Amino acid sequence: MEEPQRARSHTVTTTASSFAENFSTSSSSFAYDREFLRTLPGFLIVAEIVLGLLVWTLIAGTEYFRVPAFGWVMFVAVFYWVLTVFFLIIYITMTYTRIPQVPWTTVGLCFNGSAFVLYLSAAVVDASSVSPERDSHNFNSWAASSFFAFLVTICYAGNTYFSFIAWRSRTIQ
């Protein structure tokens, strides 16, 4: 007794998508926001980049490895300098409008808040490590880097405030 063979009929539907399709927009050209640099947050980001560059180059040009505390200052200064340049590029090219999946106001608040706290600690460490008795040859560079570290800290505090205002206005809506 053989069972009759039934015709197998299965419908299979497949779709193909790519990760890049989720981030595509209608235009392929980059936008450029000229007005961003004229805003106070834009000005503060440029100031953070310039002053942060001064902080780590003034230390890097010395024999900072003799004072272990300057390792922390160098880490914070270089790390946040690179990330701030990255964020400036994102803001100027308006890349944040092309990636709406990222909560940019929250990212900005977390970035600026952490930069403020860590730069404040680095500035205090920098200032407390400067001593003319320790190394008179590097004293001026280290003292100047300490001064600029506090200025960068003030800039990050300002951007933290503006990021908080933007974040709060997004969460209230």
From Swiss-Prot:
Keyword Phosphoprotein: no
Tissue: Highly expressed in liver and pancreas.
Gene Ontology annotations for the cellular component aspect, listed alphabetically: cytoplasm; extracellular space; membrane; nucleoplasm
Membrane-spanning ranges: 40-60, 70-90, 105-125, 147-167
A Pfam match: MARVEL
Domain MARVEL: 36-168
PROSITE patterns: MARVEL
Assigned keywords, A-Z: Chemotaxis, Cytokine, Cytoplasm, Membrane, Nucleus, Transmembrane, Transmembrane helix
Alphabetical GO biological process terms: chemotaxis; myelination
Keyword ATP-binding: no
Record-level Gene Ontology MF annotations: cytokine activity; structural constituent of myelin sheath
Family affiliation: Belongs to the chemokine-like factor family.
Protein name as it appears in the record: CKLF-like MARVEL transmembrane domain-containing protein 8
